[in-house]
Amino acid sequence: MGKRKLGVIASAFVAGALVCGSTLVNAEPVMTGGPVQGKALWTDYSGMSKEVQGPVSQILFTQSPRTAKGDPYQNYPHYIPEGSRIVLFDLNTKELKVLTNDFATAFDPCTYWDGKKFAFAGVHKKGGGCQIWEMNIDGSGLRQMTDLKGTCRSPIYYAAGSIEEGEGRIIWRDRYFEGDWKEHGMVEKTGMIIFSGSPEGVMDEFHNPYAYNLYRLDTQGGKIIQRITGHVLSGIEFPHLNTTIDQITYNLSSNFDPWLTPDGNILFSSVQANGSRAGGEGRVMICVDNWDGAYPRPIYGNCDGEIGGTSGRSQAKITFGDRKIVYVESPYMNWGVGQLAAVSWDAPFNKTYEKLTGKDGGLYRSPYPLPDDRMLVSYAERGDFGIYWFNFSKCAAGDKVYDDPNWNDHQPAPVYVKYKPRWINTFTAGKNFGVTVVTYQPFDQVKVEGYPHSWGTWICFDTTLSDQPVGPYPHQKAKNVSHGDIKAVRIIQGYQCVEPDSTRFRVGAGAHLLGGERSSSNSGTAFQQRGIIGYQYVESDGSTVTSQLSDVPYYMQILDDKGMSVQTALTWAYLRPYHGRICSGCHYGSYRGRAFKNIHAKALYNWWYDDRSHYDSPFAFRYLKFDNDGNYKGVKHGEDVVVPSDIYYGGPSGTTSQPVEGLTLDKQRTVDFRRDIQPILDAKCAMCHDSNNPPNLGGGLELVSVDGIAAYSRAYNSLLEPQRGKDPNIGGKYVNPSAAINSLLVWRLYEAELSANAPREKIFPIEGRLLHNKFLTQDERYAIVEWIDLGAQWDNIPGPDFYPGYLVK
């Protein structure tokens, strides 16, 4: 049988793309049975065949009431129906059995490998919110799997450590390379569950009342992971349920609809809405990640030129024979119905894109490919969804399986014995724990005691590489750069929007400013609250390496000799504890089909061989250094920093508990307009800039009412004012959020042409005029640069504070 190597790809979310180091190896599938019901065989990567589908005689599916609340497909992915139920339908006898009578609502069924049980999401009649449950296929053996404050949905099974059934021994050594292997008990090899969850009280970047991310669920109280890594899974524990969950993705908007790929990865949809991303509308991309969150990488929908634009992309699954990614393409990002579209799994580019439906005038949802090349779908011609076999030759719904006119029938889950794909090894045991392993065996548990947060490390081979043009948008290059032009990187953490006091928070408070409807009382722009994890220097060849917080959403900016962002990554990235990430440059696009030059980067050499870097890698620095003219002179730590120079792989652990920059949340910086910028304007600018000499920077921190809402000061309203006829995503009259280098305010403060994108004509019109570059100190000027590059927010301090802000009167 032929083998196909999909490539060794190295990458990370940078300038809208995420590419990560991973070797994905697959074999061509060998199918028998054809398009009719029968037996299909799958040849895995090592040439061993297993039966993946016998006769399909039963189908689980969801029935939802035909009301907006009963089937809220226009509120996707926050799909929490009322009164839905899961039923078992026998294709031979045509009998229908309701399995979830004890639930107020139940949906999202997914069958186990042997077809004898299934996982689902549901709200029990006894209460407790929307949780993950498990039940035998006959309706017996109900087991609750989560007890999370929030919403859990879309469970799928993952066969980690459970390719063979039965019990497995937990064997590991105490720490490092010391001692003998010891047995620490037995555990049933039931594998893991991956699901999508939204904690209670969070909002996404559109201020919707949810923000989903993917979690992995240890069905044996953390011991499945213990058998693999040597440490019990650390995360959110439910001892009364004997389960533990660990968040594996970090996105300020939503990651949802997980599905298993043939090579053991997790396929899912990801809403990317960082600030001005995709014209401020955001974009839904199809993404793939390891089951522990180690290597997220984009597949399709991440690029400006990809077909479908800002449409919704959900419920993606991979067909077996021709290996297509089939998904629901919706006219709106928050719709869960639409038309079926597809791209090749092996070459997910525009040339392989195809629209599978659209000529019959109906709506589709819930595609489910089978190994014998058939596919179940849910289809509605006039609002009544039923279950059908899809007719590929006619690009339309074919033979009807079941359609009850009183219910919307959807989410089919055929019952059959499934093949367990090769599972990918994990190097993290959850929050704050990383491990080093030899394939499928626990080897060395690593945790640095005393430090307040675990970290990960990433390296970029060349920060000057980019496929983006020079342009005024933050994700584009502000100017052309070569080796030596990029001096440092700024690492920015996004803060999840959590505002429990509705009297102190107002969505759309800055509708009159650049942020429009995506603004809030925290920000007059589309950029939510965020802080600076730190800075790291860039080598002369454009490479850089750094360590920083793990398990937080972040993105990067590359900085020139003035410390200004030349290009901003507008896709959220994340590191898992003690993992590494390799970045190849600033680009968009799918990681599949990319090939990267193997170069000897200085940062890589210094990381491994320089004595100054033997402690894992340089941690992010708190500040940049400049001369009096504003020229970059290096990075610097704060006065009270502790650098863990005696911590290195295989060495002593827990040497200090002092704050460490890049690791300690208390050591993180942010720039808050009220605290940091308004005092500069009051002291240096307001005496000249008033209503007769705009921008009007007077009035201090007194809130000014606009359209009946008093959320910001007069100075903030003036600086964030839009410019007629100008796209607000490239700024207004004075400020371009996330691109200080393209902002009129900064050009005047530095009295220099800073980029290839002049904010307006005749910026320096009069010779002998008053020069602004002498009024502010370099620290004051750079504080304004940082404020704009972060997104020009009003309130960048999460939680309550004593500075002025919006208040319902």
Curated annotation (Swiss-Prot):
It comes from the Bacteria. Gene3D superfamilies: TolB, C-terminal domain (2.120.10.30). Its main location: other. Heme 1 binds at C583, C586, Y591. It is found in: Anammoxosome. GO terms for cellular component: anammoxosome. The keyword Metal-binding applies. GO terms for molecular function: metal ion binding; oxidoreductase activity. Residues 1-27 form the signal peptide. InterPro entries: 6-blade_b-propeller_TolB-like, HZS_alpha_mid. Keywords: Heme, Iron, Metal-binding, Oxidoreductase, Signal, Zinc. It catalyses: hydrazine + 3 Fe(III)-[cytochrome c] + H2O = nitric oxide + 3 Fe(II)-[cytochrome c] + NH4(+) + 2 H(+). Induction: Is among the most highly expressed proteins in the proteome. Zn(2+) binds at C303, H587. Pathway: Nitrogen metabolism. Residues 633-792 form the Cytochrome c domain. The alpha subunit consists of three domains: an N-terminal domain which includes a six-bladed beta-propeller, a middle domain binding a pentacoordinated c-type heme and a C-terminal domain which harbors a bis-histidine-coordinated c-type heme. Component of the hydrazine synthase complex that catalyzes the condensation of nitric oxide (NO) with ammonium to form hydrazine. The alpha subunit catalyzes the second half-reaction, i.e. the condensation of hydroxylamine formed in the active site of the gamma subunit with ammonia, yielding hydrazine. Part of the hydrazine synthase complex that forms an elongated dimer of heterotrimers composed of one alpha, one beta and one gamma subunit. This is Hydrazine synthase subunit alpha. It comes from Kuenenia stuttgartiensis.
